[in-house]
């Protein structure tokens, strides 16, 4: 009876080890594929227009800030007839980014206290 139990434990251990190796190989293949897709996407990306620069030639090309994409905002300057468009960050998104930064900083402090 002890021999059967010992043999069963050995069999389960070998099976779990082999399945863990298969899963590691599977995850490694997924990571390699994901990295290659990201590199292709970066190569395909166009140059973006920085904040407060003219975006009248393409209104969808503004750069991203930390969390949100800037928006091409058009307006007429005082005493002018021609429209001026610049990439800007709306105020509500600016406040949301500040709040997210403070929450992230506070989360780090809590993690340091309890972790």
Swiss-Prot record:
InterPro entries per UniProt: Spider_toxin_CSTX_Knottin_CS
Signal peptide from the UniProt entry: 1-20
Propeptide part(s) removed at maturation, as residue ranges: 21-44
GO MF annotation list: toxin activity
Reported tissue expression: Expressed by the venom gland.
One term under GO cellular component: extracellular region
UniProt entry keywords in alphabetical sequence: Disulfide bond, Knottin, Secreted, Signal, Toxin
Cysteine disulfide links: 48-63, 55-72, 62-87, 74-85
Subcellular location: Secreted
Free-text note regarding domains: The presence of a 'disulfide through disulfide knot' structurally defines this protein as a knottin.
Family, similarity comment: Belongs to the neurotoxin 19 (CSTX) family. 01 subfamily.
Name of the featured protein: U3-lycotoxin-Ls1r
Organism: Lycosa singoriensis (Wolf spider)
Lineage of the species this protein comes from: Eukaryota, Metazoa, Ecdysozoa, Arthropoda, Chelicerata
